[in-house]
Structures are given as C-alpha cells and as structure tokens.
C-alpha cells in the first residue's frame, strides 16, 4: 500500500491511515501533529490574491478614474503593478541564490545585505503591514456604518476594534484555518467580481450617475480632471496600497512544501490576474459612470453591480481577508527577527506554539499596533503611510538583487545556486529525517547536519534494527539451514561472521540504511548497495567463502564517498530552465529602485524623510545592540564605490593613447663596498678570498627619486 503524505490541507483522513501502520517504538511521536504544508495554488496564489484584493480596489478605483481619466488611470494602474512586478522578480532572483524561509522579506534582505539592514527593513515592513491592516479594517467599518446609517466616527472605530479582535482569534487558531478561510473568501470575491461585470451592461441607474455605455461618455472621461487639492502623485499614493500584497507568498515560505517552485509561480500568477482585474474595473467604471459620480461616490461600483449585496459582500470579505493576511505575515517576520537575536528587546517573540510554530506573542503585539492606528479612522490618511513603508521595502528588495548580482558577477566568483529541494529529495550525506522537520528563521543554511539528538538516535536505531520484511526474508532463507541434515554439512561460522549476523551489520559500506528508505537515496549509493547485495548473495551460495576475510577487502574512504555523492547529486538536482529566469535582470531592479525612490519624494516628501530618519535610527541601534550579525553575501559590494568607478573616470580629462608611456622597472642602484677581515699573507695567496662582509645603509638601498 502506498503511503499518503500527511502534509495536506485536509489531512485528518490521511493521518488515520498513517497511524494505523505499525511503526518502531523509537519513531512514535506522542502529543505531536505533523505540520500542515501548502502548495502553489492553495497557499501562495490564494494569499497573494486575498492581500491584493482590498479596500482600494472596491472603494477607490472609481475615484481614481474620476480624477485621472480612463487613459491615464489605466497607465497608473499598469505602473503600480509594474513596480510590484519588478519587486517580485527581484525577490525571486534573491531566493534562487539563498532559498526561501518563513522570514520572508527579512530573510532575503538579511542574507544579502546583512542582519543589520535586514532587521531594519523587516521592522519597517512589519510596521507597514500593521498600518495596512488598520486601513483595511477602517474601510470595512466605514461601509458598515454607512449601511447602518451611523455617521459617528466612534461607531467606525468600535466596529473596527470588534473586527480586529475576531481576526485575532482566527490567527491564533493556526495557519490551517487561515488558509481554509482564504479559499472560501477567494471564491466569494470571484462571485462579487462577476456580479460587477454582469451588472455593467444589464441595468441602469441614472439617478446615481450610472448611465450605461456610450461613446460620448467614454470620450468625456478619457482625459484627467483632478479635484481641488489632488494631483497624479496624490492619487498614486492612495492607490499604491492595492499592490502591497505581492510579497505575501515570500512571507509564508516556512509553511510551503516546495517554496522554490511555489513562490515564483504563485506570485507571478497573482500579479497577472490582479492586473487584468484592475484594468477591467477601471475601464468599466469610466465607460458607464459620469465623472461627478466617480469622484464623489466611493460606492459607485455597488450601483453598477447587478446585485448590490454581492458587491458589498465582496468588499467586506476583501477588507477582512487583507487584514488577516497582514496579521499572518507580520508576526512571522517578527518571530524570525527575534530568533536571530537582531534586537535583544524582542527576544520574547521567538517562541511559537504548535507544529507550525505559530507566533502567539508576535500576533498579539502586531494586533496592538494595528489597533492603535485603527483609532485614526480615515483611509486617505493611512494610505500614504502604507505607501511609503512598502515602497521603502520594495526599494531594498530591488537593491538586494542588484547588489547580489554585482557581487557575484564582478567582484567574486559566482557560486552554484542552491539546488531545489523537493518534498521527496533526500541526499545520502544528510539525515534521514531532515526533510520531515520544517525550518523556521533565516539561519537554516548555517545549521550543522549533526544537530538534533532525536535524529541521531533514530538513525542509529535504523542501522541496528532492520525492518520486519527483511527479517522475514532472512528467516525464510535460513529454514533450509535449520535442517539437521544441512547443519552437518555446514562448517562453523567465525567470530566476525557471527557478530555481523547478530547485529545485522554491513561491513562493506560506510553507512547503513533501512530498506524502506532506500528508494529515496541517491543513485550512486543505491548502485553500490545493489552491487554489495549481489556479492553477499554469491558468497552465501558458495561454501568456500563462509568466513570472508574483511582485512583484504578495500575500505571506502568516507570523505571520497560523500564527495562522490555530492557531485552526482549536483548533476541530478540541477535546476531546470524556467520561463521567469530571463525576466530577472539586476539593471531593471536598479531602475525600479531609483524610480520608487523618486516617487516616494513626490508623493509625500515629509513622510519619506520621516521614514528614512526612523530607519537610520533603527539601523544604528541594531548595530550597537547586536554587533556580531551576519554581514551578508553581498558585503564585498559597495554601491558608492561602484558609482565612483563609473563617475570618476568620466570626470577626468582623458589622455590620448600617444601620451601614455609604459616604462620597465629599473633595478635599484646599489654600490658594493668590500671590507677585508684579515691581512694579506703569502701562505694563503693561492686561495680565493672568502669571508668578506659588506655593510649597506638604508639610504643606499633606497635610490633617490
């Protein structure tokens, strides 16, 4: 019977089948469940779509088209998605070299730029997630208060606090319930989007500005016409949080079965689908509604929908799901920062509960910060704060990939990328249970293979106690030997052979593995094991080799064996060519970082300077509190030195080729003065003069220039 994987979304049924099979006593895990791991579509794609579909899409798309017009609005939406796409590609490029862990953005940046910079950007990203969650909850509370006829600001705040506490309980229940709820919410969002598209050409509502399709209306809405106090960059700052959920897949790397494949595919698919839906929303609203209704009525899309209740349901669900996504990713980043001891004051956040290491303390802390910003109670005030923090994070992700590429291509030899680790991949030089224990934090590559007494104990027990099937086969093979007639024919076994049979050891191989796990070993070791079994079978058939001479057998060098296995594993685990590899360009990442930096100052230069000042303070504080952090794989690359190498030669006056003269180095002019130690004597006149000494001063050795 094939053994089913327990790492599924609904794994209770699979667990029953697995627990029914007998296991050795040293492998039984009491009071412990297997961690729940997810894939590309149920994990990454769902989380990204839930985070991208937020309040901004349902409440501010019409306002965007009313100010910028249809043409410029489509360009603005495409530009926002392009900035997010460049960041996703940069993150994929960094992850291809360093892997993906549960730390997400923090782990990527700290592995490239060092723990000090990674901790700074990670804290800013967590802060931005908290503010974004407050913005989503506030938008949800505004809609509920308008629906109930409550215009008081404290009613909005009360609803927001109640919703935040409910989402806090769901997050504390575990990641399994978060993903299950997200699948249902994504289905309801698809229904509400379809309701909006169908309603745009099935009915009209002229009283609220919904007059239907007409070429004249589309022509009047094609050009921008801003409201008083608004501009292109203010509209951009309000709409940019619509693309802040693209990094949600990177933040859940520790809860994925194969993050190296799931994160790139799921993130790119979510960005493409989101861009298409944004274009549909913006074009349809500009083609069927008047400009006055678009700029004044934030719920104009609800009038366009066929069933207004379904659209409001999608709005409420998107608000809750986006906030829940922020409450999921931010605490795990804080947990990784605490586990790496970047900030000693946050050490109490390192512990987790359950098999998935749910960060309970970090979830409570981020919920308190979100509740503090819920008291602001205005979406347009919170949106620029979210924009600045997320753009700072995106700038650092883009720069990380650029610095990593420059450090590996220009200043240092390019190492081989980390091979993709599948769920069933097991190397012969690793522990047998290494793939069963998921890793959390950004220090996974630095861990030694010898850590963990449980793994060592299990491996030792597997070496000494072989499976039951092999024992039964040996018993069947030895029935003939138990016959008294056959026992007389056989000679007496030697001491070495008796010891080998009693402990079931294999003296010919450096390692001994159980039969059930032999299918997961590398090709090299399997070949050696099969050849050795054939040799043992041939020896048992002959009577002349009952006691093998182990001293004459060549022993396999342990280091050579592991080196051979690693070389063959590199050939087997070589990464296949993927379609998104050609899109990861360091120069595009640098251009995206510079463009994002410029847009930050244009949107809100005051918020930008304040955020940079806070980032500088946190950076220097981490340097003082934890001076021994990892420097990063791109520590030998300096952006200012790189700029200097380009700018300084261009600023100097270039000399012609005829004026460049190359002189060969001339040896130093040193005068040798001989001093005779003894007087001349005729007795030794035939001998050569030996034992002479000379003294050279420092000035004589150094010629004058």
Swiss-Prot record:
Q: Is the keyword Cell division assigned to this protein?
A: no
Q: Which GO terms describe its biological process?
A: inorganic cation transmembrane transport; potassium ion transport
**TM spans, by residue?**
38-58, 69-89, 92-112, 121-141, 159-179, 181-201, 232-252, 268-288, 306-326, 368-388, 390-410, 587-607, 612-632
A GO MF annotation of the entry reads: chloride:monoatomic cation symporter activity
Would I find Transmembrane among this entry's keywords?
Answer: yes
Principal subcellular localization: membrane
Gene3D superfamilies linked: Amino acid/polyamine transporter I
Coiled-coil portions: none
Q: Which family, according to UniProt?
A: Belongs to the SLC12A transporter family.
Task: Please state what the protein is called.
Answer: Solute carrier family 12 member 8
Species of origin reads: Mus musculus (Mouse)
Q: What is the primary gene name for this protein? A: Slc12a8
């Amino acid at each position: 019977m094939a053994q089913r994987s327990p790492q599924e979304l609904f794994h209770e049924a699979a667990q029953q089948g697995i627990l029914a099979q007998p296991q050795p006593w040293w492998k039984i895990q009491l009071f412990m469940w297997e961690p729940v791991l997810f894939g590309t579509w149920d994990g990454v794609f769902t989380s990204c779509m839930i985070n991208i579909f937020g309040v901004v899409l349902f409440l501010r798309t019409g306002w965007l088209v009313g100010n910028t017009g249809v043409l410029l609005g489509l360009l603005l939406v495409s530009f926002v998605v392009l900035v997010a796409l460049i960041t996703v590609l940069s993150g994929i490029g960094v992850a291809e070299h360093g892997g993906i862990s549960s730390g997400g953005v923090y782990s990527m940046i700290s592995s490239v730029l060092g723990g000090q910079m990674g901790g700074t950007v990670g804290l800013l990203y967590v802060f931005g997630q908290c503010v974004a969650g407050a913005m989503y909850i506030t938008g949800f509370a505004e809609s509920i208060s308008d629906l109930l006829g409550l215009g008081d600001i404290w009613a909005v705040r009360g609803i927001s606090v109640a919703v935040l506490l409910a989402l806090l309980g769901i997050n504390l229940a575990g990641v399994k319930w978060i993903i299950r709820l997200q699948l249902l919410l994504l289905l309801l969002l698809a229904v509400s989007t379809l309701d909006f598209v169908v309603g745009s050409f099935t009915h009209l509502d002229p009283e609220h500005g919904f007059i239907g399709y007409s070429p004249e209306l589309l022509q009047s809405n094609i050009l921008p016409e801003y409201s008083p106090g608004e501009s292109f960059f203010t509209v951009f700052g309000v709409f940019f949080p619509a693309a802040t959920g693209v990094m949600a897949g990177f933040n859940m790397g520790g809860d994925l079965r194969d993050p190296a494949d799931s994160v790139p595919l799921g993130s790119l698919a979510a960005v493409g689908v989101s861009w298409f839906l944004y274009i549909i929303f913006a074009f349809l609203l500009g083609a069927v509604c008047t400009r006055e209704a678009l700029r004044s009525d934030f719920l104009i899309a609800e009038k366009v929908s066929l069933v207004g209740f379904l659209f409001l349901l999608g709005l409420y669900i998107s608000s809750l799901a986006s906030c829940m996504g922020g409450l999921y990713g931010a605490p795990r980043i804080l947990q990784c920062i605490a586990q790496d001891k970047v900030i000693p004051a946050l050490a109490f956040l390192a512990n987790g509960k359950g098999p998935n290491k749910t960060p309970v303390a970090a979830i409570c802390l981020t919920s308190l910060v979100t509740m503090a910003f819920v008291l602001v109670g205005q979406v347009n005030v919170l949106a620029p704060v979210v924009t600045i923090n997320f753009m700072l994070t995106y700038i650092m992700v883009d720069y990380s990939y650029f610095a990593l590429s420059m450090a590996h291509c220009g200043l240092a030899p390019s190492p081989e990328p980390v091979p993709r680790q599948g769920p069933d991949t097991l190397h012969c030089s690793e522990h047998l249970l290494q793939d069963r224990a998921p890793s959390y934090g950004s220090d996974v590559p630095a861990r030694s293979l010898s850590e963990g007494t449980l793994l060592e104990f299990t491996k030792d027990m597997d070496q000494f106690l072989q499976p039951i099937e092999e024992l039964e086969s040996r018993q069947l093979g030895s029935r003939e030997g138990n016959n008294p007639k056959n026992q007389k024919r056989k000679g007496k076994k030697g001491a070495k052979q008796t010891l080998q049979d009693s402990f079931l050891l294999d003296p010919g191989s450096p390692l001994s593995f159980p039969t059930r796990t032999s299918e997961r070993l590398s090709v090299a070791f399997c070949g050696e094991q099969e050849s050795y079994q054939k040799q043992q079978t041939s020896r048992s058939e002959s009577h002349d080799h009952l006691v093998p001479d182990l001293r004459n057998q060549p022993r396999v060098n342990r280091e050579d064996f592991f080196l051979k296995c690693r070389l063959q594993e590199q050939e087997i685990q070589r990464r296949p060519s993927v379609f998104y590899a050609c899109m990861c360009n360091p120069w595009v990442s640098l251009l995206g970082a510079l463009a994002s930096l410029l847009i930050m100052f244009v949107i809100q230069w005051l918020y930008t300077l304040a955020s940079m000042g806070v980032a500088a303070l946190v950076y220097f504080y981490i340097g003082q509190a934890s001076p021994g952090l990892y420097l990063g794989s791109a520590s030998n690359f300096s952006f200012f030195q790189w700029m200097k190498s380009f700018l300084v030669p261009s600023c100097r006056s270039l000399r012609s080729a005829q004026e460049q003269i190359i002189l060969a180095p001339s040896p130093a002019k040193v005068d040798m003065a001989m001093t005779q130690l003894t007087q001349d004597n005729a007795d030794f006149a035939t001998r050569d003069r030996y034992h002479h000494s000379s003294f050279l001063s420092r000035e004589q050795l150094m010629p004058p220039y």
